[in-house]
Regions:
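ATP-binding glycine-rich loop module of kinase domains
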Residues: 28-67
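Short beta-strand micro-motifs within the conserved protein kinase catalytic domain, predominantly
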Residues: 78-98
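Activation segment signature within eukaryotic-like protein kinase domains
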Residues: 125-126
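Catalytic-loop of the protein kinase fold
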Residues: 137-153
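Conserved activation segment of eukaryotic-like protein kinases, specifically the C-terminal portion
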Residues: 173-186
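Conserved catalytic-loop aspartate of Hanks-type protein kinases
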Residues: 198
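Conserved C-terminal C-lobe helix
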Residues: 238-252
């Protein structure tokens, strides 16, 4: 079933509306709302024209991503709908034009796990996340800005959100628009994004999830030093079986890194969990 059909019955009246935009983003023209309708909660994102061209272009790129994936398989997307903002009553007084993006509210996928979680369950979670990432790549797209919060739980599956920095696999652009926390070493050297840079970001996400802690650095330069020179992977003794996977995801040289989700998935299936 195409995800867009799942919220095709969306009414334009809501029980609760709350502005969630951070102050700095708001000043740049970005708007992010949560809206409830009955038992369902949605997110609405749009950009006010002529405030910040870079952010406006990024949002328009995300809308175009959804338009191009409307007919194709959407197994990696949360239920969504692109909507004419002029039809939303609560925006009438703002005289807001253009289009906005509705997405169904979903839970974080990479939540904290307890020590009681067995290794088979952890591997299952990783493979579910890879299903979404593989579907994205097979549709011909690179996410370009993967973060832990972009992996969402929908029913019994993992889905992806936030495609403002997405690019075509066959024609990536040399744009420094990723988040330094998750940037592959080659991106700091001006190389274009790729499937492998998505996999590197996934490696950082996976590493932090397994360790239940986050990497830290203060400046862009500090992140560059960390990813290009200083990153060392250590796992708790109970999770050592996943070390070869992280090693293959976080190779500093792109030609030594896993080349595809399929290659990564095959490596995961060889892990001895005994």
């Amino acid at each position: 079933m195409n995800s867009i059909m799942l919220i095709s019955d969306l009414d334009h009246s809501f029980d609760e509306i709350a502005l969630q935009t951070k102050q700095k983003s708001h000043s740049y023209g970005r708007r992010l709302y949560t809206l409830t309708q009955g038992q369902k909660k949605y997110w609405l994102k749009f950009h006010v024209e002529q405030h910040n061209q870079v952010l406006e272009d990024s949002f328009n790129a995300e809308l175009e991503f959804y338009r191009q994936n409307k007919i194709s398989s959407s197994d990696f997307l949360v239920p969504y709908r692109v909507i004419d903002l002029s039809k939303l009553n609560f925006l009438n007084e703002m005289r807001q034009s253009g289009e906005g993006l509705f997405t169904l509210d979903t839970n974080d996928f990479f939540i904290k796990f307890s020590p009681e979680n067995d290794l088979h369950e952890i591997r299952k979670q990783i493979l579910l996340a890879l299903n979404a990432l593989e579907a994205l790549h097979q549709s011909g797209w690179i996410h370009g800005d993967l973060k832990s919060e972009h992996f969402r739980r929908y029913l019994d599956t993992c889905r992806l959100i936030d495609f403002e920095q997405s690019q075509r696999v066959i024609s990536p652009k040399k744009l420094l628009t990723a988040t330094p926390h998750y940037m592959a070493p080659e991106l700091f050297h001006g190389q274009p994004k790729s499937v492998q840079s998505d996999l590197y970001a996934f490696g950082i996400i996976l590493y932090e999830w397994l360790c239940q802690s986050r990497l830290s650095a203060k400046t862009y330069h500090d992140w560059a030093i960390l990813h290009c020179q200083q990153l060392q992977i250590k796992l708790p003794d109970s999770l050592q079986c996943f070390l070869p996977i992280l090693d293959g995801l976080l190779k500093k040289k792109i030609d030594e890194r896993f080349g595809s989700v399929t290659e990564l998935r095959n490596a995961i299936r060889t892990i001895n969990l005994l």
